A protein has these predicted regions:
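RNA-interacting cores
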Residues: 1-234
Length: 234
């Protein structure tokens, strides 16, 4: 598994295009990976997750993948300095039960809501599957509760802080939009990002390693799901 750190040039017209359209950003990220002649999406096949973090001078683009990327296809002047790519295998060996880490995660916390009967009928007539509607969680408490539930599924818990509350802080991040094409039909994309900073304790190393590799939550193609770990803070 590999992690790329890209220092983007915020004056680049190509980056500004990507920043304005989340699907274009996805395409730029995926340009570093081989095309897949299969039914499995290339992002899923290569285990690609990415996150755009604000920095003092603009943005840092982090990209995690199962295979080593080739960033030579990036447009000229997209970066202000050479990319940094490191092998994460040594870090994965530190993932053991009971270990505590500081972490950052940008996610798209939602809850599934059953569609109204009229809406389900309309979807059926259009040949679409009867899927629930996903509603964005907007209050800090509901966002924290969502991550606690994710921890139960993915082998970690959020410890209690000094104030008696979960040691985590959700911050509303930017809402991103874009447009993809399904056949001849354009499809509008809207992703509400929430950034989580805090601490976690691993309870099941196998489940947590899978979560590290594959990400958690929805919106993984669009900047969500990547978990970054660091030594715990005092």
């Amino acid at each position: 598994m590999f992690l790329s750190k890209l220092t983007v040039d915020v004056t680049s017209r190509h980056f500004r295009r990507d920043y304005a359209d989340i699907h274009q950003m996805h395409r730029t990220v995926m340009s570093a990976f081989p095309h897949i002649e299969d039914d499995i999406p290339a992002r899923q096949a290569h285990g690609v997750l990415w996150r755009l973090d604000p920095s003092d001078r603009g943005f840092l683009l982090y990209v995690q993948s199962h295979v080593e990327p080739d960033w030579s296809s990036l447009p000229d002047h997209y970066l202000t300095q050479p990319q940094e790519v490191r092998n994460l295998q040594p870090a994965l060996q530190a993932v053991t039960g009971g270990s505590k880490f500081a972490f950052r995660l940008v996610a798209n916390p939602t809850r599934a809501v059953k569609r109204e009967e009229a809406e389900q009928t309309k979807r059926a007539h259009a040949g679409k599957r009867a899927q629930p509607r996903h509603v964005v969680l907007r209050t800090p408490q509901s966002q924290i509760d969502w991550l606690v539930r994710q921890g139960e599924r993915h082998g970690f818990v959020i410890p209690t802080g000094r104030n008696g509350q979960p040691d985590i802080a959700p911050y509303p991040a930017l809402r991103t939009q874009g447009q993809s094409q399904t056949g001849t039909q354009p499809h509008r994309i809207t992703i509400d990002h929430v950034r989580y900073d805090g601490h976690l304790i691993i309870t099941d190393s196998a489940k947590f390693t899978t979560a590290l590799r594959d990400g958690i939550g929805r919106g993984k193609a669009y900047g969500c799901g990547l978990i970054s770990l660091a030594p715990p803070r005092n």
